[in-house]
């Protein structure tokens, strides 16, 4: 059945995966609330003194260098080491990579440390693959379609899943390309919906790691969960303040059947 | 009268205590909004260059090492010095102590600097007392009952009040043990409800320091205020996004009588 | 026509100015959501390695030293250099200047680097002008009227616009003084409404820089937009949690005519 990937939503709620987020200060609160509403447990342990230790007990790790202090860069490097040693899946969100030189260099340095998934917008994925110059701040200037080659290149290089967020989302692994139509444009007007999707991707990977659900399906399910919640929120709210509230509510309320009926999945 | 502790709510609103929060980046915004809604004034002055100076003008200080950068640790140490010199009550929230070694060492180093109150979950309080290993990230794995001995030990050692948050809250000082039944499970699904309770505890201590209300009653009242607001919010909302909004509203709207009628206080 | 300044709201929505915010951790999320709701694009690029580079592509820069780490101070200095070199307008929000010695010294050091606008409360503006001692944390203890001389002094010294927030707002440039009556007292109970107004001021300046709208009118319009949204929110909500949601909604929904009909502008 085409929507079997949705079983992972049930696993997230059953396993309440502990997700360690090394992420930017702008979205920490929202990311934590997204994880809690979705059924996961957040912990923003990001200092070099603690991040490796914690990555060994976490079920998933998010690395998002959105506002990277020197100390947080060190914390990220340590967390990745800790995650790899412990076999904890980690997710790379290359925020604004391409657009800014220091973080581009940093992301290029960690992309080969086997992230289980990469999640970004088209311009970030294109830039991370070395195929383009990046977007405008956190906004993409490339189309999702234009990022397909870059995503495939990165998927092969990392052995992980690469997800490109946009009007339609693109989920790519070495031998599979899936398109997901879901969500609502209003998601762009609430800060942190993209960044927290990176964290939720880590939650889904952590919750399904011992199941027969593939990493590709887990990443797809995380995106479908967020997209469906965006659609439900858009039915209830038409401005971004109340939309953000309705979005968190919907992440919590929505069940797998509702997600399946709201989103459109297409294997390419 | 059993609920005389509730007079402190009135004092918070009259005195608008200035609460200096050295807290983690995840909950800064929510903590500030909780303080404002409850009637206090927040100021997150946390750098070593300014924290001691500010602790002398603040009415209460919160120390919560949830995402502790090296610089913030220094700021905390300075703030505690400034608070003690000025006689400003300070509150220790030992987030994830026990679970992570560096912050455990730090918390053990400051616990003897006479915090007016300690507020944590059962596992954190047990670990801080040296009686156990801590929880899972920010989640408790010990029951509140199991933390009674640790709370009493810490209360005697510090001369302050120790509050253990859980299904029922436990408020302990050297010669008194109070159980508080209040709140709603949904509070666990909104990030920062626990951390902001630490800040509100500092607000209540600061607002009542020159009154005849005991520190024990002030800490109890802070917990009752939050618990009652959680109950009111749960009557209005059944998912965490709208619950968080209703919780802030209820902190602002609720009066002492309503708190008294909603919570259940039991001296042990 | 007295309300011609309101054309700048249309320009903000047309041009979606990219606003680089070097601001305090407490209000980053709220500031980003305010900018998005108003029609701008936020980017919190604040490290010394990236801030100058980004200031050259941003349309406006906000400098708000609310929780200033040593690294963020360096980032601010670099961002101002980058902004000046590129001709990007930058806004100074002197949070708690006067009340705390280190940030006062820092603000005094950058005030002569030609901020396009300064936005603060009365006590902050008075202290920045060297005419008084500052307020209580982030709260003003001077009246807006009492800050007129300080605002005029700073406007002449910087060549920019100086805005004093209060019960009525005061917008001052070298040869013009405008009073704005708008807003609602509930705005004071939501953290970040003042700080995000600084960011929105940068958005308005950035969006109108190539138009025939004066910087004075752009700053005035930013304040009117926020004030009107506060008034609309106050019609829908009577407690700060739901007020904050309604405020973001109103920033998004309100059009120039509605702003004009809600606020009261008076040239002095």
Curated annotation (Swiss-Prot), chains A, B, C:
Pathway annotation: Cofactor biosynthesis; thiamine diphosphate biosynthesis; 4-methyl-5-(2-phosphoethyl)-thiazole from 5-(2-hydroxyethyl)-4-methylthiazole: step 1/1
Taxonomic superkingdom: Bacteria
Reaction catalysed by this enzyme: 5-(2-hydroxyethyl)-4-methylthiazole + ATP = 4-methyl-5-(2-phosphooxyethyl)-thiazole + ADP + H(+)
Matching CDD domains: THZ_kinase (cd01170)
Biological process terms in GO annotation: thiamine biosynthetic process; thiamine diphosphate biosynthetic process
Keyword ATP-binding: yes
Pfam families reported in the protein's UniProt record: HK (PF02110)
Annotated ATP binding sites: 119, 165
Coiled coil stretches, renumbered: none
Cofactor(s) recorded in Swiss-Prot or TrEMBL: Mg(2+)
GO MF assignments: ATP binding; hydroxyethylthiazole kinase activity; magnesium ion binding
Annotated positions binding substrate: 44, 192
Keywords: ATP-binding, Kinase, Magnesium, Metal-binding, Nucleotide-binding, Thiamine biosynthesis, Transferase
E.C. code: 2.7.1.50
Enzyme class at the top of the EC tree: transferase
Listed InterPro entries: Hyethyz_kinase (IPR000417), Ribokinase-like (IPR029056)
Cross-referenced NCBIfam families: PRK09355.1
Job description of the protein: Catalyzes the phosphorylation of the hydroxyl group of 4-methyl-5-beta-hydroxyethylthiazole (THZ).
Recorded family membership: Belongs to the Thz kinase family.
Annotated protein name in UniProt: Hydroxyethylthiazole kinase
Organism: Corynebacterium glutamicum (strain R)
Source organism phylogeny: Bacteria, Bacillati, Actinomycetota, Actinomycetes, Mycobacteriales
């Amino acid at each position: 059945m085409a929507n079997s990937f949705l079983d992972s939503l049930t696993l997230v709620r059953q396993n309440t995966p502990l997700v360690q987020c090394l992420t930017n200060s702008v979205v920490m609160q929202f990311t934590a609330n997204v994880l809690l509403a979705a059924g996961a447990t957040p912990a923003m342990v990001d200092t070099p003194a603690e991040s490796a230790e914690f990555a060994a007990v976490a079920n998933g790790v998010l690395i998002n260098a959105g506002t990277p202090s020197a100390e947080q860069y060190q914390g990220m490097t340590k967390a990745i080491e800790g995650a790899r040693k412990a076999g904890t899946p980690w997710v790379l969100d290359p925020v604004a990579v391409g657009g800014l030189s220091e973080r581009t260099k940093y992301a290029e340095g960690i992309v080969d440390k086997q992230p289980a998934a990469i999640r970004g917008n088209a311009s970030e994925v294109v830039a991370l693959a070395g195929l383009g110059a990046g977007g405008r701040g956190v906004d993409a200037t490339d189309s999702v379609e234009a990022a397909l080659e870059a995503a495939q290149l990165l998927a092969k290089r990392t052995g992980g899943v690469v997800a490109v967020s946009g009007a339609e989302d693109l989920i790519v692994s070495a031998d599979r390309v899936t398109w997901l139509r879901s969500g609502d444009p209003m998601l762009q007007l609430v800060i942190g919906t993209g960044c927290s999707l990176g964290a939720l991707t880590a939650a889904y990977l952590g919750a399904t790691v011992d199941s027969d659900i593939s990493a590709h399906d887990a990443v797809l399910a995380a995106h479908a969960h967020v997209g469906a919640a965006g659609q439900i929120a858009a039915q209830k709210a038409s401005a971004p303040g109340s939309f953000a509230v309705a979005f968190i509510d919907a992440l919590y309320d929505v069940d797998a059947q509702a997600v399946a009926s709201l989103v459109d999945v297409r294997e390419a």
